Amino acid sequence: MSTHFDVIVVGAGSMGMAAGYQLAKQGVKTLLVDAFDPPHTNGSHHGDTRIIRHAYGEGREYVPLALRSQELWYELEKETHHKIFTKTGVLVFGPKGESAFVAETMEAAKEHSLTVDLLEGDEINKRWPGITVPENYNAIFEPNSGVLFSENCIRAYRELAEARGAKVLTHTRVEDFDISPDSVKIETANGSYTADKLIVSMGAWNSKLLSKLNLDIPLQPYRQVVGFFESDESKYSNDIDFPGFMVEVPNGIYYGFPSFGGCGLKLGYHTFGQKIDPDTINREFGVYPEDESNLRAFLEEYMPGANGELKRGAVCMYTKTLDEHFIIDLHPEHSNVVIAAGFSGHGFKFSSGVGEVLSQLALTGKTEHDISIFSINRPALKESLQKTTI
C-alpha cells in the first residue's frame, strides 16, 4: 500500500467514515485509519439505532444541517443494499411550560416551517396507548423524521468508500502527528503515512490525542447505556407505528425507539454521569445499579407496558464539550488540518452531513454549510485552547 495520500482521516467512525466516503466519491486518494474495525462496539455508534430529528431541541441553528443530513441518508439508502432509515416519526414531550427542550423544538419547527403535530396530554395517550402522561404535558410529533440503523450506516459508507478506492487501515492506533504547511504525517505502530490534508475525528479519543496537535480543548468522555426491554408488541412495535421519542421529564431527558422485529423497546437516559477514559471504560451493562434503575424509573411512569424483562443492555460513550455544541473547524494553526470533535451525545444523526462538511473543509478550506456555531474559536472554548486542562 502507498504511504502518501491526498487526505488521511484519523478515526473512521460515524463522522470519519462519512467523510471518507465523500472524498472517495470525488476521486480523492483517501486513507482512513482506525484503532478498531468499524463498525464496532468500542465507540459511540453501536447499539443498532439512532434517532434523527429535524425540529431540534438543542438549538434551531441545527435544523439546516439536520435536513441536509436527512437528504444524504436517503441518497445513501439508494446506493446500498443495507437498511439505513425508517420513517417512524419522532415524538417529543414534557411538562407544558416547564420543558425548555420541548419549547425549543416547537420554535425550531415554526422557524423552519417543518411539518409537525402539536398535542396535549390526553391526545398523546389516545394516539399512542402505550404512553401514559399527565394532562399538563404537551408534545410535538414530527412525522417525517425517524430512526437510523447506525451500524448499517457506517458499514454502507465503508463499503462504498472502499469500492471507490479508499483504503481503510484497521486495528491501528495513531501515536503522533507531524504537521507542516504543505503536508501532514501520522505515526503508527505499523509505520508512517503522509498526506496533503488531515481530518481528525477520533471520537472519545480526541480527548487524549488532540494535545499532540497543540490543542487542549476540554473534552470529557462519559459512559452511556441503553437497554432493550420486553414490551407489548401491540403497543410499542414499529409495525403499529409507535414512534421514536425524545422527552424531557422532571428527572431528566430520555430517548427511545420502537421495537423492531421483537427486539423490545430500546431506551436511553441522556445524562453526563460517569466520567471515563475510553481505554479503560467498563463496558459491562449493569455493573452499576443505575444502569438499569434509571431506565426502569421512566418505564414505570410513562411506558408501563414496556417495563418487561431486560433483553439486553449496551454501553457506549458520549464526548462532551463545555457548551454541548460540536467542534467542526479548521485547526487554528494549520489550515491543512480539519477537526471534528465533541459531539456531546447528539451527533450521529448529522454524520452524513458532517462528512460532507469535513470533505469540503479538507479540499477547499471552506464549506457551503453555516458551521459558525461549531467554531473552534467560540467563546465557550477559546480560553481552553491555551493548554487548559479538564
Swiss-Prot record:
SUPFAM superfamilies per the UniProt record, alphabetical: FAD-linked reductases, C-terminal domain, FAD/NAD(P)-binding domain
Entries under InterPro entries matching the protein: FAD-dep_OxRdtase (IPR006076), FAD/NAD-bd_sf (IPR036188), MTOX (IPR045170), SoxA_mon (IPR006281)
GO CC annotation, single: cytoplasm
Modified residues (S-8alpha-FAD cysteine): 316
Residues reported to bind FAD: 6-36
Disulfide linkage: none
Reaction catalyzed: sarcosine + O2 + H2O = formaldehyde + glycine + H2O2
Regulation: Pyrrole-2-carboxylate is a competitive inhibitor. N-(cyclopropyl)glycine (CPG) is a mechanism-based inhibitor and inactivates the enzyme by covalently modifying the flavin.
Major subcellular location class: cytoplasm
Keyword Lipid biosynthesis tagged: no
Molecular-function GO term, any one: sarcosine oxidase activity
Intracellular or extracellular location(s): Cytoplasm
Keyword Ribonucleoprotein attributed: no
CC cofactor note: Binds 1 FAD per subunit.
Pfam families the UniProt entry points to: DAO (PF01266)
EC number(s) given by UniProt: 1.5.3.1
Keywords from the named record: Cytoplasm, FAD, Flavoprotein, Oxidoreductase
Lineage top rank: taxon: Bacteria
Cofactor: FAD
NCBIfam families per the UniProt record, alphabetical: PRK11259.1, soxA_mon
Biological role stated in the UniProt entry: Catalyzes the oxidative demethylation of sarcosine. Can also oxidize other secondary amino acids such as N-methyl-L-alanine.
Name this polypeptide is given: Monomeric sarcosine oxidase
